[in-house]
């Protein structure tokens, strides 16, 4: 009897929160900034998630699958992905709505998830990793490696970088954002200076089932260095001068009278 009363109290609290949830969404929609005046159809996605993993709470805001903001719950502030978005990150006035969403999500996970465990199938995504450079590759010039992780669900993972199988430190915190289809994607960035024989790897480990995806990067199609460009220009100039001299010689020879009888 006591157990039934406790379950009823939990469900009653859940119904009350479900009734309040649309009101919190209305506050959020009213404070959503208009970034571009474009008559085409676009999608602004505000996704808050919580889970038994790292990170245990997260919020991402995307525009047509491109992340604009994440949320730092320890500082209670938005974090722009690019400096150009900083002015929109401040003063949105929806901190109370975000706090409500966080509490609601944590309550669902705490009160409802244990009752559904073993009764509904568990979804898993096999992560796919890809590594590429942020700027065109030039040996000896600073650049950034990007590890892009797709098909991520649930969004709990660790990312490790290696150079010639040795761990590399200094990577940026992993950025997670929601995409269409109730899945997530993530980005990890590593600043580096490329050399001709580099071999970098990005290892992505899914915390739930310990599934690991590895992506490798080796230099390909590098732009010519300044020294090589100067050498090629010098060779081209020398060939041009040599061709001019040969042309003049042939012209002079053609003007000489033929020796006859």
From Swiss-Prot:
Topological domain ranges for the Lumenal compartment: 27-231
Glycosylation site positions: 41
Molecular-function GO terms, alphabetical: MHC class II protein complex binding
Main function: Plays a critical role in catalyzing the release of class II-associated invariant chain peptide (CLIP) from newly synthesized MHC class II molecules and freeing the peptide binding site for acquisition of antigenic peptides.
PANTHER family, per the entry: HLA CLASS II HISTOCOMPATIBILITY ANTIGEN, DM ALPHA CHAIN (PTHR19944:SF50), MHC CLASS II-RELATED (PTHR19944)
Subunit note: Heterodimer of an alpha chain (DMA) and a beta chain (DMB). Interacts with MHCII; this interaction mediates rapid selection of high-affinity peptides.
Stated name of the protein: Class II histocompatibility antigen, M alpha chain
Organism: Mus musculus
Gene: H2-DMa
